Amino acid sequence: MSAPQAAIDTDHADRHGPRRAWAAVGVLALVGTLNYVDRFLPSVLAEPIKHDLELSDTAIGVINGFGFLIVYAVMGIAVARVADRGAFGAVVAGCLTLWGTMTMLGGAVQSGFQLALTRVGVAIGEAGSTPAAHAYVARNFVPQRRSAPLAVITIAIPLASTASLLGGGLLAQSLGWRTAFVIMGAVSVVLAPLVLLVVGVRQSLPAAPAVVDKTAGGWWNLLRKPSFLIVVAGTAFISAAGYSLTTFSPAFLMRTRGMSLGEVGVEYGLATGAIGVLGLLIVGRLADRLAERDPRWLLWIVVTLTLVLLPASVLAFVVEDRMLCVLFLALSYAIGTSYLAPSIAAIQRLVLPEQRATASAMFLFFNAVFGSVGPFVVGMLSDSLTDDLGAQALGRALLLLVAAMQLVGAICYWLASARYRRDIIEEAR
């Protein structure tokens, strides 16, 4: 490692101590869980919302997928610029308050258009929280130890899936989907003061070493790095599959396996939570260990994970047994959560400290923009097949698209690894 590179990687003289840093990671994981709970609610409650507001599968796909994620992607970069000044806690707390408030307002909507407007507000609020959390980790953990805390934060996704399916599903079944929105949103608003207390309002950033040319690690320069562009292509396909599963799996189980909303919440919610958390912890820890030998393992581990679990993405829509179907869906869903921690850790090594939140936001921008196409296409294909296949149309659409998108994503990650090491070395030039 050259001197300039060492200067970039050891910018932690003013970092939080291990106890506080891990406590903050725990709080950020809780925030992330609420982030995804509020994001997943319309998907979990898609069936009652669809019937109450008289929406089509295409409309559900646009509101929960394309429309939400486009706003999320664009605003993420804008808010991340504030976080890059060290205002990690302030950004997260402000975003938390906004999206919680907008989720509560979602319980009062009377049309699909009004629901879409509240989801725009949720998207704006959630946009800045994740990049700020990633930047906090990069600021307070050395490069070889970032995948584990990032994995803990990313555990929010399967935990949120379980919480939204269990909590949201059971609340909706007993009190109605509108009440579920109000209660879940209120929990987010209440948590904001804890973020300011543990994470802090802002944290000072190190001065960039004089020997380093800032343009070499600038976030704009990511667009000229082959490894970043190919990883972006890979995450586009993997996230498209993941968002499709998130949006339509509950509806698929209810339509084709005869499950009630409460049963989906308990069985599918617990399965995705348990498998997702286990997968993230294993992948995050393993990625850190392997990356010490070769940083390309941050990408290779995504390839390995996807190929090992890929058969589940086919079997989930073929097997008739209800429990096997739930198990395979949860395994397929785990691809779309476990790959994030090593991917983000890889991206963080391509930029300077003051550009990390923006780099993370750029990654999530492409993840969201291209990933949002998945639910939209699945919804349209399902609607087009309904006349011929009836209730089986949604399952057929998912069968045709999910595994194919995941496979293409794995191929992209493999191709990106060929250039990744060189792109890191360029930071020292």
From Swiss-Prot:
Under InterPro entries, the record lists: MFS (IPR011701), MFS_dom (IPR020846), MFS_spinster-like (IPR044770), MFS_trans_sf (IPR036259)
A Pfam family recorded for this sequence: MFS_1
| CDD domains recorded | MFS_spinster_like
Its transmembrane ranges are: 21-41, 59-79, 86-106, 115-137, 150-170, 181-201, 228-248, 264-284, 299-319, 327-347, 361-381, 397-417
Extract one GO cellular component term from the record. Answer: plasma membrane
Q: Keywords, A to Z? A: Cell inner membrane, Cell membrane, Membrane, Transmembrane, Transmembrane helix, Transport
Query: What subcellular locations does the record give?
Result: Cell inner membrane
User: Which Gene Ontology terms cover its molecular function?
Assistant: transmembrane transporter activity
**Which superkingdom?**
Bacteria
The main place the protein resides is membrane
Q: How does it sit in the membrane?
A: Multi-pass membrane protein
Q: What happens when the gene is disrupted?
A: Deletion mutant is more sensitive to capreomycin, more resistant to rifampicin, and accumulates more ethidium bromide in the cell than the wild type.
The Swiss-Prot or TrEMBL record describes its family as follows:
Belongs to the major facilitator superfamily.
Cited function: Probably plays a role in bacterial growth and resistance to antibiotics.
What name does the UniProt record give this protein? MFS-type efflux pump MSMEG_3705
Upper taxonomic lineage: Bacteria, Bacillati, Actinomycetota, Actinomycetes, Mycobacteriales
